[in-house]
């Protein structure tokens, strides 16, 4: 059994024109930038910050999943998950230590 023979006819450019592809580095390297709503806590006399630094990955223009914030992010403290609500034992009270923490569940609040 023989394989079928395929014949292709190609036209060549007789003028001898050459195309040159030159690769160039991006104009700017990726870097950290601050949004307009970021507050500088270092020089405001505050003792602590409620949130840590937040990295926002670049968005892909044709991928809607990169447009919206993650589900685990909250309005005031992005990047941290909300703690699960613990039910207090019936007839008793939960510890005051847990009630003093902020809503985001991170160790900064």
Curated annotation (Swiss-Prot):
Pfam families: PPI_Ypi1. One of its GO terms (cellular component) is nucleus. InterPro entries: PPI_Ypi1 (IPR011107). Residues 63-109 are annotated as: Disordered. Residues 73-87, 94-109 have a biased composition (Basic and acidic residues). GO terms for molecular function: protein phosphatase 1 binding; protein serine/threonine phosphatase inhibitor activity. This is Uncharacterized protein ZK945.8. It comes from Caenorhabditis elegans.
């Amino acid at each position: 059994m023989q394989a079928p023979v395929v014949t292709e006819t190609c036209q060549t450019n007789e003028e001898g024109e050459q195309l040159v592809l030159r690769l160039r580095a991006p104009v700017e390297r990726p870097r950290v930038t601050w949004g307009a709503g970021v507050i500088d806590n270092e020089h405001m006399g505050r003792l602590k910050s409620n949130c840590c630094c937040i990295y926002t990955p670049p968005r892909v223009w044709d991928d809607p999943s990169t447009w919206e914030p993650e589900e685990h992010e909250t309005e005031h403290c992005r990047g941290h998950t909300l703690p699960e609500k613990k039910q207090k034992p019936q007839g008793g009270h939960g510890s005051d230590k847990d009630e003093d923490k902020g809503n985001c569940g991170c160790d900064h609040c």
